[in-house]
Amino acid sequence: MWAYIFGAVCPRKGKGAGLVLPYCDTEAMQEHLAEIGRSVDDGAHAVLILDQAGWHVTPKLKVPDNITLMFLPPRSPELNPVENVWQFMRDNWLSNRIFKDYDDIVTHCCAAWNKLVDQPWKIMSIGLREWAHRS
């Protein structure tokens, strides 16, 4: 079995929405979009930056009305601020560990994500990009 962390952050507000799931496919992405949609403030709109993974671009996705998907060019993950979130989580909370079993992996993934979202200043620090705010 596998454990996948699906996560999105709002660097401006220091907020995050995430799920830990045993699969990485269209159904998982649909659950993630629903979670993000629920976390967007009333009257606000989120722009979700994505690579072009198959489960991101499938026409089967039903995107909530309060989310717009923005796709990066192929082979350019460095343009997505959330990649720095994954690197930070690996470097600080998830790498170089021995897990007892699958449940321990899921528990550590959930704990790492929850630790991140409990530190809004960390999300802001990792995710804000000067070029993203230029007019």
From Swiss-Prot:
GO terms for molecular function: nucleic acid binding. This is Uncharacterized protein y4pE/y4sA. It comes from Sinorhizobium fredii (strain NBRC 101917 / NGR234). It comes from the Bacteria. The lineage of its organism: Bacteria, Pseudomonadati, Pseudomonadota, Alphaproteobacteria, Hyphomicrobiales. The keyword Protein transport does not apply. Keywords: Plasmid, Transposable element.
